[in-house]
Each structure stands twice: as C-alpha cells, then as structure tokens.
Amino acid sequence: MSVTSLSFPYGESIQWFCADNAKNLPSSPLKEWLLAPGSLTQKLKGCCDKFEVKILGEGQCVPLEGEYPKQNAVWVREVLLCLDSVPWVFARTLIPQSLLSTRQADFLGLGTRPLGELLFSQDSFVPGRIEIARFTTESRLAQLAQSLAQNVEHELWGRRRYFHHDQEEMFVSEMFLPAAVQAMAKLKLD
C-alpha cells in the first residue's frame, strides 16, 4: 500500500451537513454505516479477521478553514482503518490542546491503537451529533483512494462525529473508501 503521491495532512476543507436534515443520503447499507450511533471501530472489527490502524501522520496543525470552531492549532491524527490489509476508512481526528493533557486519555501514545477503543471505553467522553459529507471523484479523498489502488467511480461519503469531554469538544471524521462501499454492497453489511 503506497500513499506517497500525497502527504500529511491529507484532509481537505469539507462542507458538513446535519444528518437529521440530510437529503439525498446514499442508499443502504452505506447509509446505516454513516448514521450508526456506536463505535465504528467495533463495527469494522466484526467484518474482518485482522483489523489494523495505519498512521498516515499526526502532529500539531492549524485546522482547515471551517473545520474547527477556533482556528487555534489542534492535534491532528490521520489514519487508515484496514480490514484484512485493505483500507476501508480514512479517519481524521482534531483534538484541542487542552484535551491532550487529559489523564484519562493518552492521545499522544495511541500509536496503532484505534481511537474508538479509547473514546467508547470511557464514560468521560460523550458521543455527540453526527454530520455527513459527500466527496466528488476529484476530491483529495478520491486522490488518496486512487493512490491506494482503489478506483473511484462514484462520489464518496463520510461522517464527522463530535465527542465531548467536560467543556471541550473534539471531532472524529471517518470517510469511507471505495473498497468499503463495494464490500458493504456485496456482503449486504448493515
């Protein structure tokens, strides 16, 4: 798997919309995956023998325009979630500096551990609303998929989930790559 044609950060400025008001959502089963209230990590692990997190990059960055309420630097982590060595999801997480020092969470020491395991195993992180986005076949996400040898014939979809910890908020964006969408349709994975 090579992603050398692009470099960290891979993310792009995205127009997110509220899932509750979303029109023209994709058909099932992708729609159910986008709106699933629980841990995407757990859902993905149920679809494979080997689940793996491949880190594309992480570090302090200024958020993209419109990506975070404050334009202060945040910790950005970008990974691929792979099922049986095939990338299914590109994930981009934004963590405010104030949360990096939280005792309950060792964000900087996650390594290849899935972030979802940490967030859904602690009551101090409360899952919030889900927003949805679609990506054209010319988007940076599509370019990333193509660099992973995944053909992009149709628009791609992703979701952004808010997580609250005390007065702080972090965002986890999960974009479904073509291999995931094809497998969901083929296996009828809801």
Swiss-Prot record:
GO biological-process terms attached to the record: pyruvate biosynthetic process; ubiquinone biosynthetic process
Organismal lineage: Bacteria, Pseudomonadati, Pseudomonadota, Gammaproteobacteria, Alteromonadales
Protein name: Probable chorismate pyruvate-lyase
Organism for this UniProt entry: Shewanella sp. (strain MR-4)
Role of this protein: Removes the pyruvyl group from chorismate, with concomitant aromatization of the ring, to provide 4-hydroxybenzoate (4HB) for the ubiquinone pathway.
Subcellular localization, as worded in the UniProt entry: Cytoplasm
Enzyme kind, highest EC tier: lyase
Entries under InterPro entries matching the protein: Chorismate--pyruvate_lyase, Chorismate_lyase_/UTRA_dom_sf
Residues that coordinate or bind substrate: 77, 115, 174
Keywords from the UniProt entry: Cytoplasm, Lyase, Pyruvate, Ubiquinone biosynthesis
Pathway: Cofactor biosynthesis; ubiquinone biosynthesis
Keyword Membrane appears in the UniProt entry: no
Catalytically driven reaction(s): chorismate = 4-hydroxybenzoate + pyruvate
Single annotated GO MF: chorismate lyase activity
EC number(s) recorded for this UniProt protein: 4.1.3.40
